[in-house]
Amino acid sequence: MQYRTFGEDTKLQFSGHETFPLRYGWLKKAYDAVKNNVKDPAAVFSADEGIRSFGVGKNMVASIRFWALSIGIIAPIAKTPSAYEVTDLGKLILDENGGDPWMEDPASLWLAHWKLASTADRNSTWYWVFNHCPHVTFDPVSYTHLTLPTTPYV
C-alpha cells in the first residue's frame, strides 16, 4: 500500500523564515505595510523598502513576509507574484476594527497555528509533523529518523 501525504500538485517548502521564529507584532506590521502600500505593492518587502519600513535587516524582512504568507494574512497578487494584498482573514483579525489586531487572544494564536499546520504547500514541515506523525512527544531523534507508520491512520 502506498502512503500518500501530499497531493500531486503540492509544492513543498521547507524554508523561508530565515531561522527567525514568528515574533509579536510581525503579522500586524506586515498587514499594515501591505494595506498602506497600494501604489507599489511589489515594493513592500523589497530589500530597501522593507528595511526602512520594518526597521529590521533584510533577512528579518524575508521572515516577516514568510510568516504573513504562511498564516494567510497576505497573499500574492495573481498576475504579479512579487506583489501582495491583504486577505479577508487579515482584514478580519488585524484591521483597525478587526477582532484582534495585536494577536493577543489565545484563539487568534490557535487560528495561526491551525493555518500553519493545515497548509502543505507553504508550510510543509508543520503540515507533516502535525498531520502525519503519530509521536506523542517531540524530540530530535524521533524527527531526525522519521518513518511513516506501516498502515495509514486517520
Each language-model region and where it sits:
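Short, amphipathic alpha-helical interface elements at domain boundaries
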Residues: 1-129
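A short acidic, leucine-rich amphipathic alpha-helix
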Residues: 50, 139-146
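Membrane-proximal, non-transmembrane interface segments of integral membrane proteins
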Residues: 130, 135-136, 140-142
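Single conserved hydrophobic/aromatic residue that forms the stacking wall/gate
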Residues: 145-154
